[in-house]
Structures are given as C-alpha cells and as structure tokens.
UniProtKB/Swiss-Prot annotation:
GO molecular function: protein folding chaperone; zinc ion binding
InterPro entries reported for this sequence: HSP_DnaJ_Cys-rich_dom_sf
Ranges annotated as CR-type zinc finger: 49-123
Protein name: Protein BUNDLE SHEATH DEFECTIVE 2, chloroplastic
Family recorded in the similarity comment: Belongs to the BSD2 chaperone family.
Expression across tissues: Expressed in shoot tissues, in both bundle sheath and mesophyll cells.
Localization in the cell: Plastid, Chloroplast stroma
Domain of life of the native organism: Eukaryota
Residues given in the record as Zn(2+) 1 binding sites: 62, 65, 108, 111
GO cellular component, one term: protein folding chaperone complex
C-alpha cells in the first residue's frame, strides 16, 4: 500500500523531449529506386578527323531578333506612343500604341519570342532546309 501511495503523490514528469535520457527519433524517407534524373552513358571514340565530314555549323539563334525574342514595334517604331500631327504640325497628340501597349517591343514572329529557332511554338524543321 505504501508503494501505491508514493506513485500517486509524485509530481508529473516533464515531457520526453526535455529529458536528457529520452532517445532521439529521426525519420528518413525511403530512397526510391527510380530517379527523376536520368544518367546518360557515353563511350569514347577515336579522334579520327578524316572520317568525319565537315558539317556547316548552323546557328539556332534567331536572325530577326538576334536571340532577344523581341523586336522593335513596327507600328510606333519603338516610341510606345502613336503620335498624330494636327494643325500642320503645330500640335502633336499621341495615344498609347495599340500593338505593343507602350512596351516599345513586340514578340518576334520568326521564333515566337523564344530567341532561337525550333523553340516553343516554332515550325522550324531541320529536314526542310
């Protein structure tokens, strides 16, 4: 009976995280056998330049926008404002360009804004050239 009385009168113990003797639990996610990143294996070949045909290196950068993806607006010519002369040039009024909306540049039509041929929605095809 004395043993049960001493158990009920003891103060509550601190949480297990505050005890120095509590074991530390660490959980790790299981490693998947299938990686998201694929590895590419390459094989070394002999450096035989005579067997290789010299191919012309084609630039994939867009020639119209020079790889920028945007060209100067054709409507406002890069001003951002379409200006109109009134009273024989004495008064000039302008409104925001409707094509570029004042940004002074529009997307390149050749590369569709990608900056290189064969990007995004381009219809560039190697076999056609």
């Amino acid at each position: 009976m004395a043993a049960t009385a001493s158990l009920t009168t003891t103060a509550p113990s601190p949480p297990a995280l505050l005890k120095a003797s509590a074991p530390l639990l660490i959980s790790f996610r299981p490693v998947s056998r299938h990686c998201k990143n694929l590895c590419i294996k390459t094989k070394a070949t002999e450096n035989d330049q005579s067997a290789k045909k010299h191919q012309k290196v084609k630039s994939i950068l867009c020639q119209d926008c020079e790889g920028n993806g945007a060209i100067v607006c054709t409507k406002c010519e890069g001003n951002g404002v379409n200006s109109v002369d009134y009273f024989e040039g004495r008064f000039k009024a302008g409104s925001l360009c409707w094509l570029c909306r004042g940004k002074r540049e529009i997307l390149c039509g050749n590369c569709n804004g990608a900056g290189f041929l064969g990007g995004f929605l381009s219809t560039f095809d190697e076999t056609a050239q």
